[in-house]
């Protein structure tokens, strides 16, 4: 079973993840990133949305989906992404691997500098919690594009 989550806060501002929906129809090849992205697209209809949304996929050590959550939304010029929620979701869902996915509503497959910045920040969050980063992807009507991880700073050696 695969769950779709959101983060809720109680009266003391303590976070917990809440199950929005549960899906029993996991993808046939649940360890293939491509089949997982197509599965996410079928559940969220990402490629047809008129606005941009950012999702996190949580995986176990065998790279099977544990769950997913929307962590940001916006339009082409600006997207509000809540990195606090990303960290909480990864920790509270028990993620051992994670993937970040977003859509481009204007059917643009090329990555922007903001997409590269998102990929870098997500990689930093994964490194902080010792979670393997499975990549960053863009879903559009034209197809799926992977954003290369590139060369990022190793913050442990910067003084």
Give the location of each predicted region.
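Active-site-proximal loop/helix of nucleotide/amide-processing enzymes and allied scaffolds
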Residues: 1-26, 35, 58-62, 76-159
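Extended substrate/RNA-proximal surfaces in nucleic-acid metabolism proteins
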Residues: 32
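Mobile, glycine- and charge-enriched loop segments
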Residues: 36-79
